[in-house]
Regions:
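Short glycine-/polar-rich loops that comprise or flank the Walker A/P-loop
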Residues: 16, 43-46, 293-297, 320-323, ...
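Generic enzyme active-site microenvironment
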Residues: 266, 300, 326
């Protein structure tokens, strides 16, 4: 178990009204009492100065959560400061001079796991909740954090353990009168229940996994088609340079955008055309890489030119399939009436007049999974789905073992399914797995 005291800023970077510094370790009150002008009281907010060498660092609210009733299971102190990064970093430096170390990413939650305050899949749910890209993903992560995923996996485990115990009894003590009366029919009924529970978890896990994917949309097309102008309208700011000179955008630029409470990444790319300009060629190559990574493409066309042979060549040569055609500059052709047309793969708009831009937002919104009963979902990770599939493959082999009366092989498949599901909950995890999970967290969590 780790016991050295650690600290980190728990709020986002930058200036804000308030900032939070989190500390965890053993005997924090005695370790740090000399830097507070007032005595800390367990689970009570104390208004106190932080002071050292007659220098007041800040007037703060400090809360002590004594072990074991804390997030990490150790003593935890949370310092609420004014949200100036200079103030917060100066307090971190003071703490480090007084026996506290800087926390690694995810180290607070890792300590919570190691101290049996939280299961591994709940620890992962903490990270998923922080990084959730829309409200449905938030709710699904909350379901996992509140134990829905754990409870359902644990229910299957309980059924497997029960059946394993019965099978082992028959295998090891066949002549014992106390062995359970386990017929093929009874075994089949239990296996069918396990299969049904697993299938339900797997369906919800796969759907929940899609919720946690932040979608990427790339805007591509020939130079001067208006890609950057459209993106500026979406962002409601002049984030991309816009001129009448073809080839202004020389690189792929990513932006984060909230559309109907869904966080997406949009990519502005260099215009694709034949050119000898080495810088522009590099930008075009990066545009193609953005296309390969994007979930969907908006192919932007100057409506006054139309979709010509060069556009068709670009779409074909770069194997662009999942795309919508965006006809821009309709104001130049008097085609404003086309905006109201509902085409599944075509959008007509005028970026310069901000007409039809909402059609882009609508298209993005349509791509997101619409879950009517998000309360049934949880944010499962790839490793969870892999373990569920492994367990289900073991269970799927059971009916043939039952019909052949191969109870020893049946028991072994049950054991392997047990191991797979236990891995989801973090029973006997490897150090490599823990490092992979917790290093993906932000500092301070």
């Amino acid at each position: 178990m780790k016991s050295n005291a650690i600290c980190a800023i728990a709020t986002a970077k930058g200036s804000s009204a308030l900032g939070v510094i989190r500390i965890s370790g053993d005997n924090l009150d005695s370790l740090l009492s000399h830097i507070f002008t007032k005595k800390l009281s367990d689970r009570r907010a104390v208004l106190t100065d932080i002071i050292a060498n007659n220098i007041i660092y800040d007037n703060c609210i400090v809360i002590l959560y004594s072990s074991p009733k804390s997030y990490t299971g150790e003593d935890v102190i949370e310092i609420i400061t004014h949200g100036n990064p200079v103030i917060m970093h100066s307090i971190i430096e003071l703490l480090c001079k007084n026996g506290v170390s800087n926390a690694a990413p995810g180290e607070f939650t890792e300590r919570a796991f190691l101290n049996n305050k939280i299961s591994l899949e709940k620890a992962e749910a903490v990270s998923d909740l922080i990084s959730a890209s829309d409200i449905q993903a938030v709710r699904a992560a909350q379901n996992s954090l509140n134990g829905k995923f754990y409870d359902e996996v644990n229910e299957v485990l309980s059924c497997i353990v029960s059946l394993r115990a019965q099978l082992e009894s028959i295998i090891n003590f066949p002549e014992d009168d106390d062995t359970p009366d386990l017929t093929a029919k009874k075994i089949t009924e239990q296996v069918e229940r396990i299969t049904s529970l697993l299938e339900n978890i797997l369906i919800n896990s796969k759907e929940g996994r899609t919720l946690n994917h932040k979608r990427t949309y790339a805007f591509i097309g020939k130079p001067n088609s208006g890609k950057s102008s459209i993106i500026n309208c979406l962002l409601r700011e002049d984030a991309s340079i816009v001129t009448n000179i073809a080839g202004t955008t020389r690189d792929s630029i990513e932006y984060e955008l909230s559309i109907n409470n869904k966080i997406v990444t949009i990519v502005d790319t260099a215009g694709i055309r034949a050119t000898q300009d080495k810088v522009e060629v590099e930008g075009i190559e990066r545009s193609i890489k953005a296309v390969l990574k994007a979930d969907k493409i908006f192919y932007v066309v100057d409506v006054s030119i139309g979709l010509d042979k060069d556009d068709h060549a670009i779409l074909k040569n770069y194997n662009i399939t999942n795309y919508d055609i965006v006809f821009n500059k309709i104001d130049l052709e008097g085609l404003e009436s086309r905006v109201i047309q509902k085409s599944p793969t075509e959008i007509y708009l005028s970026a310069i007049n901000n007409i039809g831009i909402d059609l882009i937002r609508d298209k993005v919104d349509e791509d997101f999974i619409q879950v009517e009963k998000v309360e049934d979902l949880y944010l499962a990770r790839s490793r969870h789905v892999d373990h569920l599939i492994d367990a289900k493959e073991c269970i799927n082999r059971c009916p043939s073992h039952i019909s052949d009366c191969k109870y020893d092989i049946l028991a072994e498949d049950m054991r392997n399914a047990h191991v797979a599901l236990s891995s989801i909950l973090g029973q006997n995890p490897t150090e490599e797995l823990l490092n992979e999970i917790f290093t993906s967290f932000c500092i301070g969590k």
